[in-house]
């Protein structure tokens, strides 16, 4: 509800040609949203964003500050990059109160980002090549180089990403449209859905509810659960992400009966991860 964010959303809503969906503007994982949300004075946003990008770039550190660059995949994560035109979007930057001049030079993901000797560790400088965002790197490493191929990575949450080829695709079902990478002069795009609670569900079962001692117990408990159980769990501890984007949603359990026990509850919690991933994949298919 920060006024800077509300102002940006209002301006972006009038610029439908930019391809920015409202749920993306609300997504705190985007850098522009986080920076605006932290600032009390709009004129400080550009300065703070420039420093945040500089500190966060491995390239800048590797080159001793000689290069201020990012690749296309990381640029797309700022919410300030025009995904269709392949450049910093002046209208979006203006909406967030950010000067495009403070943003890094965008380089092909397999391009030359500079030279490094690792702070004098190497006898001679070597070129820095191959820069990707984390989810994009996982997509590439899993061999999803063709349209229609997808990956799901699991950690605290989960990222489900699908390669949609060399043409921009705007999701109508709550997914984020983004860039996969730009290599050999060819840009490829993705659809992505992020789930907030995946592995964190098992951590919650262990640390907060103390229903398990370690995640390995979950499989045995799932097999031990009553197969007729119809318990369902929604891990909306911080709302729901893609494809629902319901920030006011709360966690809940359905279908508990007198015979519901530890095994049935743990199974429902474990299955909630799969159901969330299914929702994202179903949105991709649609």
Region spans (language model):
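A short, local hydrophobic-aromatic micro-motif
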Residues: 104-107, 129
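Intrinsically disordered, low-complexity segments enriched in glycine and mixed charged residues
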Residues: 1-53
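Active-site core segments that coordinate phosphate-bearing ligands/cofactors
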Residues: 43, 54, 59-69, 79-90, ...
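Gly/charged, well-structured mid-domain segments that form the phosphate/adenylate-handling core
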Residues: 108-112
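Conserved alpha/beta enzyme-core scaffolds, especially Rossmann-like or related mixed alpha/beta domains
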Residues: 69-74, 103-105
